[in-house]
UniProtKB/Swiss-Prot annotation:
UniProt-recorded name of the protein: Formate-dependent phosphoribosylglycinamide formyltransferase
Alphabetical keyword list: ATP-binding, Ligase, Magnesium, Metal-binding, Nucleotide-binding, Purine biosynthesis
Source organism per UniProt: Prochlorococcus marinus (strain MIT 9313)
Source taxonomy: Bacteria, Bacillati, Cyanobacteriota, Cyanophyceae, Synechococcales
Pathway linked to the protein: Purine metabolism; IMP biosynthesis via de novo pathway; N(2)-formyl-N(1)-(5-phospho-D-ribosyl)glycinamide from N(1)-(5-phospho-D-ribosyl)glycinamide (formate route): step 1/1
Presence of the UniProt keyword Nucleotide-binding in the record: yes
GO molecular function, one term: phosphoribosylglycinamide formyltransferase activity
UniProt record, GO biological process: 'de novo' IMP biosynthetic process
Enzyme class per UniProt: ligase
Residues the record lists as binding N(1)-(5-phospho-beta-D-ribosyl)glycinamide: 15-16, 75, 280, 350, 357-358
EC numbers on record: 6.3.1.21
Segments forming domain ATP-grasp: 112-302
């Protein structure tokens, strides 16, 4: 039996962490939000906040031992995972597990698990530890290729390369966008896919697994721009995606929600990536489902029941991006964005802006997917991020 409240320590306090915090507080929980800078979105609604370098093992260990939370919930990839493993051995619960957090923060480890150990279908790929190695690794894959740092987030350091002459620049971009100390890239064949999807997969304490309706999404440079739910898949495609998601999340273990990404290429379903936490493309669930991905994550973490997941006929999201470098922020056009029925705006509360930074998201639902995607696009386009 679950006894509430619980104390949750959140590692990473961005927009996803903010929604996790709100969902946790609705269940009476006490939330400590941690990040590398003060005033991060989740800190604005958390009970307590801590600013630290979460890649520093000593600092991370000290904060967790000081607060003695019931649960540690990583919300970002860049963490001192060796410290999490040590703390887990001491009896502190890490969601989903310290091992899962370590594997999924590195593209090479999650790809090796998926491809070599679990025999899931993935894009053809190779690794390179230098610009020279990258030339030899890319050639057999054919052109174009996609080059990514083994450690990065939100598409940072990712590029599409059409010929050998572009590889050195791609290597430099990958190193500039890399997190951590790994001078290594993954180079993949470029897939001419029909659709990218995220399958939100929920592992529960009793060992059962639930799935949300698939979410279609579009990215630019590896960074989410819009998403919609439910995405249109054939029965066989959905069966394949669920089977692969079940296989890899079972291997990673633990409880909570996982965002499992796939490419759809004709009849093939190809594994792409996995996040062991709520996913940015899943922000659409704040309007599309009776229980958002954040509420589902918390219910699984706290061993609370999930009787049913209901999904709207059609729902969509579109990100709101900054265009300028701004040290203080205001927003124009909110009243226009909210003038249409079944439309919502989330402004994340980030303290500053830079070109291309995600500052909010527009959400819409209705009966027709084409109509709701257009409605979300209009709402997002109405918002201007201006100097405060």
């Amino acid at each position: 039996m679950t006894v509430l409240p619980k104390t949750l320590l959140l590692l990473g306090s961005g927009e996803l962490g903010k929604e996790i915090t709100i969902a946790a507080q609705r269940l009476g929980c006490h939330v400590i939000a941690c990040d590398r800078y003060s005033g991060a979105p989740a800190m604005q609604v958390a009970d307590q906040a801590e600013v630290l370098d979460m890649n520093n093992s000593e600092a991370l260990t000290a904060i967790i031992r000081h607060h003695q939370p019931d649960v540690v919930i990583p919300e970002i990839e860049a963490l001192a995972v060796n410290a999490l493993a040590e703390l887990e051995n001491e009896g502190i619960t890490v969601i989903p597990t310290a091992r899962a957090t370590a594997i999924t923060m590195n593209r090479d480890r999650i790809r090796d698990l998926a491809s070599a150990e679990l025999a899931l279908l993935t894009p053809k790929f190779a690794y390179a530890g230098s610009a020279e190695e990258l030339k030899h690794a890319a050639e057999p894959l054919g052109w174009p290729v996609v080059v990514k740092p083994v450690m990065s987030s939100s598409g940072k350091g990712q590029s599409v390369v059409s010929n050998p002459e572009g590889l050195r620049q791609a290597w430099q971009a990958a190193m500039a966008g890399s997190r951590g100390n790994s001078p290594r890239v993954i180079v993949e064949e470029f897939l001419h896919f029909d659709l990218e999807i995220t399958l939100l997969t929920i592992r529960q304490e009793d060992g059962s697994t639930l799935f949300c309706e698939p979410i279609g999404h579009e990215q630019i440079g590896g960074d989410y721009q819009c998403s919609w739910q439910p995405a249109e898949l054939s029965t066989e495609q959905l069966k394949q995606a669920q089977s692969m998601a079940l296989t890899i999340t079972k291997n990673l273990g633990g409880v909570g929600l996982f965002g499992v990404e796939f490419f759809l290429c004709g009849n093939e379903v190809i594994f792409s990536e996995l996040s062991p936490r709520p996913h940015d493309t899943g922000l659409v669930t704040l309007i599309s489902q009776n229980l958002s991905e954040f509420e589902l994550h918390l219910r699984a973490v706290l061993n609370l029941p999930i009787p049913t997941i209901q999904t709207a006929d059609a729902a969509a999201s579109r990100v709101i991006l900054a265009k300028d470098n701004l040290s203080s922020i205001s927003y124009k056009g909110v009243e226009k964005a909210l003038s249409e029925i079944d439309t919502q705006i989330l402004l994340f509360g980030k303290p500053n802006a830079r070109p291309g930074r995600r500052m909010g998201v527009a959400l819409a639902k209705g009966k027709s997917m084409e109509a709701v995607r257009s409605k979300a696009d209009r709402a997002a386009a109405s918002i201007q991020v201006i100097k405060g």
